[in-house]
């Protein structure tokens, strides 16, 4: 399974990249807004920010359109695609979005169909030619719905028909989401920086390391004697 980081923060991306396990990046307007210095960011600055991300990570970088109409999505998406060959156009799963995804697919532009909350949405996006589809598991969990069940359904459907659209598990809240995604056969998990940090941690590892270090001190003292 591939690991993407879900952030627009350059420092977080650089730190995650140092681990050597990062395969790509996903961003959205909310994540970009977090890094805006004065509460807003120009569109040119946004494009420049995406370019900087592409320089850090040699892998897919999802940049989301902010328009809601098909024609406007197409214009915006084609402009974003020119930034770098690794840019993937992130499009919400709406009627207009599906039309835009179909257009991008015909033009050979990679897309990430986002805000998927049902199997039917994912299937429709795949039929339109989406490169990726992003089901949001955490947000479903928030409303007492099993988000991982959606992943299981989508993965099963896509396997039935050898659909090439890759499943990106999004809205990841904890390491359990990542592990379950891998067990279900999802292609990608896009993970916030804080959760990536949690993946490597376990209290028994900390206790074991503490014991090893104590024993190492005994060995060193014995050598001196």
UniProtKB/Swiss-Prot annotation:
Q: Which top EC class is given? A: transferase
Could you state one GO biological process linked to this protein?
pentose-phosphate shunt
- Biological pathway: Carbohydrate degradation; pentose phosphate pathway; D-glyceraldehyde 3-phosphate and beta-D-fructose 6-phosphate from D-ribose 5-phosphate and D-xylulose 5-phosphate (non-oxidative stage): step 2/3
**Residue spans crossing the bilayer:** none
Catalytic activity as recorded in UniProt: D-sedoheptulose 7-phosphate + D-glyceraldehyde 3-phosphate = D-erythrose 4-phosphate + beta-D-fructose 6-phosphate
Protein localization: Cytoplasm
Q: Which Gene3D superfamilies match?
A: Aldolase class I
Listed GO MF terms: aldehyde-lyase activity; transaldolase activity
Q: Which GO terms describe its cellular component?
A: cytoplasm
Stated EC number for the protein is: 2.2.1.2
* InterPro entries reported for this sequence: Aldolase_TIM, TAL/FSA, Transaldolase_3B, Transaldolase_3B/F6P_aldolase, Transaldolase_AS, TSA/FSA_arc/bac
Q: Keywords for this entry?
A: Cytoplasm, Pentose shunt, Schiff base, Transferase
Active-site residue numbers: 90
Region forming the signal peptide: none
Family classification: Belongs to the transaldolase family. Type 3B subfamily.
Question: What is known about what this protein does?
Answer: Transaldolase is important for the balance of metabolites in the pentose-phosphate pathway.
* UniProt-recorded name of the protein: Probable transaldolase
Q: Which organism is it from?
A: Chloroherpeton thalassium (strain ATCC 35110 / GB-78)
């Amino acid at each position: 399974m591939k690991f993407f980081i879900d952030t627009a923060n350059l420092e977080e991306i650089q730190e995650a990249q140092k681990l050597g396990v990062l395969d790509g990046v996903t961003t959205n307007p909310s994540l970009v807004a977090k890094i805006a210095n004065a509460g807003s960011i120009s569109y040119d600055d946004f494009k420049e920010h995406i370019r900087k991300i592409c320089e850090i990570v040699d892998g897919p970088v999802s940049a989301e359109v902010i328009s809601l109409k098909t024609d406007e999505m197409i214009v915006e998406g084609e402009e974003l695609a020119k930034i770098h060959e690794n840019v993937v156009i992130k499009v919400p799963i709406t009627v207009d979005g599906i039309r835009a995804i179909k257009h991008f697919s015909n033009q050979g532009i990679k897309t990430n169909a986002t805000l998927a909350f049902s199997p039917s949405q994912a299937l429709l996006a795949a039929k339109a030619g989406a490169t990726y589809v992003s089901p949001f598991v955490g947000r479903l969990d928030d409303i007492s719905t099993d988000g991982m069940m959606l992943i299981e359904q989508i993965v099963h459907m896509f396997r039935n028909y050898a659909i090439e659209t890759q499943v990106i598990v999004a809205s990841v809240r904890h390491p359990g989401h990542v592990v379950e995604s891998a067990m279900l056969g999802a292609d990608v998990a896009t993970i916030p920086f804080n959760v990536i940090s949690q993946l490597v941690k376990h209290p028994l590892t900390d206790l074991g390391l503490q014991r090893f270090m104590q024993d190492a001190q005994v060995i060193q003292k014995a050598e001196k004697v």
